[in-house]
Amino acid sequence: SITSKCGSADLMEALGIQLMVDLSVHRRALEALNFTFFFAHAFHPVFKAIMPARKALATEGQKTIFNLLGPMINPAQPKHQLMGVYSKSWIDPIAEAMGALGLNGGLIVHGVPVPNSALDELSCAGVNYHKGFGTLSDYSGTLELGTAGLAECDAEDLKGGSVEENVSLFIDFAENNNDAGIKQG
């Protein structure tokens, strides 16, 4: 992970999923499981080359354009995409770019769990901003959890743990342990 204790790739690797595999493995996984995980380094070697600079900037709290480029150069070339951005100011330009890339439709999202904080994803805490592109181009604004039928959680519940803690949480969730995940009010 660049900006947290445990990112998606860290979790996948700890679960025994090989990240550096060729496209045929991804194709089989997608067909069999309806899921695959594209590790940027496997498809875009420049991401590996710039990792030291990205990590150094991340320790200073700096995000880079590479945080945005990864999802935009997805090797699967999906027809629809949900993409999070780390700053509200990127919502409109990225939505415009995704539309120009020829995707049928999707949403660009940004979460603000508490004032003066930011997430590059939708959040069950605070407020979410979104803008659609393509077939969803009329869909934009603020998403309130209540209007989506979801209960709001405390921002503290969203903080990730170590790789080991997150693996344990994932396994509990996968085994349908009702105590796993965000506690419901």
Language model features with spans:
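Active-site-proximal loop->helix
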Residues: 2-18
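Glycine-rich anion-binding loops and their surrounding alpha/beta cores
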Residues: 13-20, 25-185
